[in-house]
Curated annotation (Swiss-Prot):
It catalyses: (R)-pantoate + beta-alanine + ATP = (R)-pantothenate + AMP + diphosphate + H(+). It is an enzyme of class 6 (ligase). It comes from Burkholderia lata (strain ATCC 17760 / DSM 23089 / LMG 22485 / NCIMB 9086 / R18194 / 383). It comes from the Bacteria. GO terms for biological process: pantothenate biosynthetic process. GO terms for molecular function: ATP binding; pantoate-beta-alanine ligase activity. InterPro entries: Cyt_trans-like, Pantoate_ligase, Pantoate_ligase_C, Rossmann-like_a/b/a_fold. This is Pantothenate synthetase.
Length: 279
């Protein structure tokens, strides 16, 4: 595996490749990330991964400085997955001058849920993903369903900007107790880690209720927020939305069996966890 930080060198290395499969990450790789590499290999060759902690998608009071950076560990894991190139640029490589041009997602998708609680987050994501796509020029790129809203925004962005890349969705990988794998899980104390699976269990109960015929979604959402708050969580949102556009379904859509997803974000101690479950 070649480890490359220069955009120029990356383009030289990939020149002539027309089936590249790309997996962008921020590093601190876990089994969830590695499953993306394996899925990428099913859809293209060679597989290129990137590791870049993107300052543009962090707010002023978020965890950019303490976000775990484990490059040598990550390199060893990617080598075992037979990744062809790891693109690991420095901030100077990616942003040699102030990034004045940004890619702004529409408010109807980028300004809700995560976008409401993390202003500017999706602008940072869209900007860096567009730039990474321009550097790697993949045929396919793999994104995890764990970041459901991000997946939808990136897919729509590629369609609307006519980027010649297919976005492949990867299923969320979970620990045995149901907790969705995340680099931020390492922030949890032992007690918090024991409590953390309750978020997934709460979403599962919502799913079962909706499939069982409960159509009062507001009641389900409020009960879930109250339940988690009573266990020491601080929920940002728990919301049942249409999979197609993350808009809340109306009664007719519920009756017609509209495909739904319940999405959630909540703090446990100082750690903010997100999760979702398709219904």
């Amino acid at each position: 595996m070649k480890v490359i930080s220069s955009i120029h060198e990356l383009r030289d290395q990939l020149r002539g490749q027309n089936r590249t499969a790309f997996v962008p990450t921020m590093g601190n790789l876990h089994e969830g990330h590695l499953s993306l590499m394996r899925l990428a290999r099913q859809h293209g060759d060679p597989v290129v991964a990137s590791i870049f902690v993107n300052r543009l998608q962090f707010g002023p009071n978020e965890d950019f400085d303490k976000y775990p950076r484990t490059l040598q560990d990550d390199i060893e894991k990617l080598q075992k997955e037979n990744v062809y190139v790891l693109f690991a640029p420095t901030e100077r490589d990616m942003y040699p001058e102030p990034q004045e041009y940004r890619v702004l997602p529409p408010d109807d998708l980028g300004g809700i849920l995560e976008g409401e609680f993390r202003p500017g987050f999706f602008t940072g994501v869209c900007t860096v993903v567009t730039k990474l796509m321009a550097c790697v020029q993949p045929r396919v790129a793999v994104f995890g369903k764990k970041d459901y809203q991000q997946l939808m925004i990136v897919r729509r962005m590629c369609q609307q900007l006519a980027l010649p890349v297919d976005i492949i969705a990867a299923e969320t990988v979970r620990d045995e107790d149901g907790l969705a794998l995340s680099s931020r899980n390492r922030y949890l104390s032992a007690d918090e880690r024991s409590e953390a699976p309750e978020l997934a269990k709460t979403l599962q109960r919502i799913r079962e209720s909706v499939l069982g015929g409960e159509h009062d979604l507001g009641k389900l959402e409020e009960m879930a927020r109250t339940h988690l708050a009573g266990r020491g969580w601080a929920p940002d949102y728990i919301s049942i939305r249409r999979r197609a556009n993350l808009i809340a379904p109306d009664a007719a859509q519920l009756e017609a069996g509209e495909p739904l997803v319940v999405v959630a974000a909540a703090k446990l101690g100082a750690t903010r966890l997100i999760d979702n479950l398709e219904i």
